[in-house]
């Protein structure tokens, strides 16, 4: 009879969790930041608020965003005007839209990741699904498993209402699953739709207005597994370590409250300072074991909470401008898609490395860091190791 220790050892994988494929998707409806103030004040029937519109236009101009993809259309707002009001009861219709559309958008990204991976979907053993909104039972994980036709035995983890740091959370979770279950292949999906947070403007809620200028919709999927079969699987990044911490006395710095009016968004003005003053401690804890203290020697996947956060981190760590190029590119092209952002940036990083004929998936560098920032104020830190670039 095998001992508990023998059984335990047999269950463990031998090598580190590795990202084996990435897929991304967005809604079809695209809005451009240059004229978004006109669009937003029109669809929310707020054109009489001329001074607030000027202020919102300045926020949009400073956002460093070129365009975003948003599921909510003008026609939908005409049909459901309470969504476009500032504080009107509207949770029921928001929920109806979200619970249907979040799994569908997640499916689009998942199918792209599965196609790149190239293996039968029956080999997916675990599913980790993350979204900020649309809580119900059974959840979006169950719906996605059915939409994709995954095995009924797939082991599911559903993460709701984590917020912008959760792109790091899902990778940390997938790492633990892959490394503690030999042969596991974990499908990770982040699907974010801003229907729950969209609302009209108010003079008394400028933090809400900032959110309306920054957030976009998108979904991203990755497949994670240990001990890849390199004859049929192509490793992209290894997940070396993963940690989470929260900054003391900052519980309200980034907050969301779900009420009958939807999810209201609250932001302290000093969030960029809070993050930038605490990020080096996270870096040191993660990289001291590797003997790394030069932050410019890393490739960077940082959640693009907004240009002010990126600027503050860049200045505090004396980062070269090119270090956050992939992050700024995703912010410009898609806005802040909450948990999905860092996975979009991972995708951009490996594509950019291929196009630039770099030696590794991390822009030619070996080591990298992935950061998620969000409510709590919570910071997720994932240490990445790139792999040699393979061209077909």
Swiss-Prot record:
PROSITE patterns: CHALCONE_SYNTH. It is found in: Cytoplasm. Pfam families: Chal_sti_synt_C, Chal_sti_synt_N. The active site is at 164. The keyword Acyltransferase applies. GO terms for biological process: biosynthetic process; defense response. It catalyses: 4-coumaroyl-CoA + 3 malonyl-CoA + 3 H(+) = trans-resveratrol + 4 CO2 + 4 CoA. Pathway: Phytoalexin biosynthesis; 3,4',5-trihydroxystilbene biosynthesis; 3,4',5-trihydroxystilbene from trans-4-coumarate: step 2/2. Its EC number is 2.3.1.95. Substrate binds at residues 55-58, 267, 305-307. Keywords: Acyltransferase, Cytoplasm, Plant defense, Stress response, Transferase. GO terms for cellular component: cytoplasm. GO terms for molecular function: trihydroxystilbene synthase activity. It is an enzyme of class 2 (transferase). The keyword Ribosomal protein does not apply. InterPro entries: Chalcone/stilbene_synt_C, Chalcone/stilbene_synt_N, Chalcone/stilbene_synthase_AS, Polyketide_synthase_type-III, Thiolase-like. PANTHER family: CHALCONE SYNTHASE, HYDROXYMETHYLGLUTARYL-COA SYNTHASE. Mediates resistance to pathogens which are sensitive to stilbenes. Belongs to the thiolase-like superfamily. Chalcone/stilbene synthases family. Homodimer. This is Stilbene synthase 5.
């Amino acid at each position: 009879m095998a001992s508990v220790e023998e059984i335990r050892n047999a269950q463990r994988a031998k090598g580190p969790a590795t990202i084996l494929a990435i897929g991304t998707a967005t809604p079809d409806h695209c809005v451009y930041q240059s004229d978004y103030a006109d669009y937003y004040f029109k669809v929310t029937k707020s054109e009489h608020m001329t001074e607030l519109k000027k202020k919102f236009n300045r926020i949009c101009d400073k956002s460093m965003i070129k365009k975003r993809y948003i599921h909510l259309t003008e026609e939908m707002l005409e049909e459901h005007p309470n969504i476009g009001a500032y504080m009107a009861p509207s949770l029921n219709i928001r929920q109806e839209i979200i619970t249907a559309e979040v799994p569908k958008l997640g499916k689009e990204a998942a199918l792209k990741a599965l196609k790149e991976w190239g293996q039968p979907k029956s080999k997916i053993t675990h599913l980790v699904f993350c979204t900020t909104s649309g809580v119900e039972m059974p959840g979006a994980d169950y719906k996605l498993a059915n939409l994709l036709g995954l095995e009924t035995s797939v082991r599911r983890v559903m993460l709701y209402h984590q917020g912008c740091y959760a792109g790091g959370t899902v990778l940390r979770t997938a790492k633990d699953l892959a490394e503690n279950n030999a042969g596991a292949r974990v499908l990770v999906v982040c699907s974010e739709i801003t229907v729950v947070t969209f609302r009209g403007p108010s003079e008394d809620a400028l933090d809400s207005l900032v959110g309306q200028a920054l957030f976009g919709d998108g979904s991203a999927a990755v497949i994670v597994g240990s001990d890849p079969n390199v004859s049929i699987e192509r490793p992209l990044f290894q997940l070396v370590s993963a940690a989470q911490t929260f900054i003391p006395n900052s519980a309200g710095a980034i907050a969301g409250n779900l009420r009958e009016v939807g999810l209201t968004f609250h932001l302290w003005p000093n969030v960029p300072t809070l993050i930038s003053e605490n990020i080096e401690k996270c870096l040191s804890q993660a990289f001291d074991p590797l003997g790394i203290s030069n932050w410019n020697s890393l490739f960077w996947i940082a959640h693009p909470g907004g240009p002010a956060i990126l600027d503050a981190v860049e200045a505090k760590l004396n980062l070269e401008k090119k270090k956050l190029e992939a992050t700024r590119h995703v912010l410009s092209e898609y806005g802040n898609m909450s948990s999905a952002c860092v996975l979009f940036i991972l995708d951009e990083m490996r594509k950019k490395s291929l196009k630039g004929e770099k030696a590794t998936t991390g822009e030619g560098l070996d080591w990298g860091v992935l950061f998620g920032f969000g409510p709590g104020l919570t910071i997720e830190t994932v240490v990445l190791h790139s792999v040699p670039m393979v061209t077909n």
